[in-house]
A protein has these predicted regions:
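ATP-dependent carboxylate-amine ligase
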Residues: 1-132
Length: 132
């Protein structure tokens, strides 16, 4: 199952997308593919840290991150309970797809969320081929 919400991203829309993922997925595994939220100004790092905490608290199985603030998000997610071995970084389709293919299983719920300039939509055709 794939939730594609990677056209625009801000702290509120990410929080709502996570809430939707949790509600729809039930007891299935949850995977988040998250690209940076852009154009947030001076508070950008703090917003990414808060989103990381929310991700970590949402019982996510795996987190895939793209962007300059990915390490901040990852650190906060790990501090909030996400296993560091289930956090992955990618810089484009070439590195994301092989890693996702290793992790994603049939029945998993995948949320793609990030600003449009992160180009997460480029991952959709491949994700659909192997289970999303």
């Amino acid at each position: 199952h794939l939730i594609h919400d990677a056209y625009n991203a801000n702290p509120l829309s990410v929080a709502e997308a996570l809430k939707t993922l949790v509600e729809l997925s039930g007891s299935s595994r949850r995977i988040v593919v998250f690209g940076d939220m852009l154009e947030l100004g001076d508070h950008s790092a703090a917003y990414h840290e808060e989103i990381g905490r929310q991700i970590g608290a949402s019982k996510i199985y795996a987190l895939f991150l793209k962007g300059d603030l990915a390490r901040i998000t990852a650190s906060a997610a790990e501090s909030a309970g996400l296993d560091r071995n289930h956090i992955f970084f990618f810089d484009g389709k070439g590195t994301a797809i092989p890693a996702l293919r290793e992790v994603v299983s049939k029945g998993d719920w995948i949320l793609l969320k990030g600003s449009r300039k992160m180009h997460l939509d480029e991952l959709i055709p491949d994700i659909r081929l192997f289970g999303g």
